[in-house]
Structure formats: C-alpha cells, structure tokens
C-alpha cells in the first residue's frame, strides 16, 4: 500500500509505502495516516466502480481502508467557506 499526498504543481508525493499485513509496516502506515489527518488533510481510497468507472471512498480511520487497496491519497480541504 502507498500513502500519497496530492501537491499542486508537483503531482503525488509518496509519504509511506508498506505491506499492511506486516505488523511493522502497518504501524508505520497508521502513524503516517494519522499524521496527515492531524495536519488537516482528507483521505480517499481510489476504487474501480461499476463498468470500470473511477470512484473514491473517503476514509477517516485506517481500519476503514479496504484490505485490497493499493493506495490512499491525501489532499487538502477546500479553502474558504463560512467563518
């Protein structure tokens, strides 16, 4: 599994990579996942929908990530809105 961060103008940046079935890798992936959420990022897992259509599922906890997921993409929340 790869944890990637979308960065404007630079594309995806690899934050962490590992096998979640390996306890050491899983711990590192969970730590980075939590760190990104603490920084205010959102997390999405790309999935292939019906008829090969691209979709993504938002996740808030590492345990919500499907076992077969190859990557999780972090991106900043939209700026603006009500104050």
Model-derived features: where do they sit?
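Generic, low-specificity signal for short hydrophobic/alpha-helical stretches with a mild N-terminal bias
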Residues: 15-18, 50-54
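Short, compact, well-ordered microdomains
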Residues: 51-83
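Short, basic/aromatic beta-hairpin or loop at an interaction surface
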Residues: 36-53
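Extended boundary segments
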Residues: 1-40
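Short, flexible beta-strand-to-coil junctions
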Residues: 7-8, 46-50, 77
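Hydrophobic alpha-helical segments that drive targeting, anchoring, or assembly
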Residues: 32-33, 42, 73-78
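Short secondary-structure boundary micro-motifs
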Residues: 26-29, 46-49, 56
């Amino acid at each position: 599994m790869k944890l990637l961060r979308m960065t404007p103008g630079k594309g995806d940046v690899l934050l962490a990579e590992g096998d979640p079935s390996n306890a050491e890798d899983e711990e590192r992936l969970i730590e980075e996942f939590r760190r990104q959420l603490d920084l205010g990022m959102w997390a999405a897992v790309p999935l292939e929908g019906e008829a090969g259509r691209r979709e993504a599922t938002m996740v808030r906890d590492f345990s919500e990530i499907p076992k077969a997921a190859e990557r999780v993409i972090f991106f900043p929340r939209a700026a603006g809105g009500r104050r």
